[in-house]
Amino acid sequence: MAEDFGFFSSSESGAPEAAEEDPAAAFLAQQESEIAGIENDSGFGAPAASQVASAQPGLASGGGSEDMGTTVNGDVFQEANGPADGYAAIAQADRLTQEPESIRKWREEQKKRLQELDAASKVTEQEWREKAKKDLEEWNQRQSEQVEKNKINNRIADKAFYQQPDADTIGYVASEEAFVKESKEETPGTEWEKVAQLCDFNPKSSKQCKDVSRLRSVLMSLKQTPLSR
């Protein structure tokens, strides 16, 4: 029993057994030591703390970390996504969106052609307006002349009609002047007499004419005995 207790006491009081060594960690440590030796041999060792502080004042003061690049072996390199790459991307987008030369020339030619067509259409429109105005003036002049000729011909025909031998027989006035003069008279009770002067009361023997004997008798009775108001 004493031996057993001695075994436990010795195991508890003694140093712990060494842990098993990790092969990967050992390999990495070996590689790091070799790289450090190569850098020391080539003169590219790690910079001193004062050099790092002087090279990166923004980091020492706690600001301006965004403006500084990446430090590798004491040299500062610009980040890949910095302002220079931004300008290059903008220039590339401009080149992509720029019109081809052929399309630009075609667009300019079309614009020039449309301007020429607009100018020609305006000139043609002005010519048509002037021609229409001239034609309208000529038509108005011809119309006025035709109206005057018709008036003269109508007066001649009226005079010839009123001067015919049977003008009094058919109940018409002898002349146009007398008819106008009588029509302007405002004698009460003579209205139906003026109407009767415009009517032909002679009976027609032609079978093609309509029978207006009843209307003639009504007009004759109104002429003799006008309506009393």
From Swiss-Prot:
GO CC annotation: ciliary membrane; clathrin coat; clathrin coat of coated pit; clathrin coat of trans-Golgi network vesicle; clathrin vesicle coat; cytosol; plasma membrane; presynaptic endocytic zone membrane
Region of interest (Disordered), residue spans: 1-80
Cited Pfam families: Clathrin_lg_ch
InterPro entries reported for this sequence: Clathrin_L-chain
GO molecular function terms noted in the UniProt entry: clathrin heavy chain binding; neurotransmitter transmembrane transporter activity; peptide binding; structural molecule activity
Protein origin, superkingdom: Eukaryota
Localization terms from the record: Cytoplasmic vesicle membrane; Membrane, Coated pit
Family: Belongs to the clathrin light chain family.
Complexes and interactors: Clathrin coats are formed from molecules containing 3 heavy chains and 3 light chains. Interacts (via N-terminus) with HIP1. Interacts with HIP1R.
Known role: Clathrin is the major protein of the polyhedral coat of coated pits and vesicles.
Protein name (Swiss-Prot/TrEMBL): Clathrin light chain B
Organism of this sequence: Rattus norvegicus
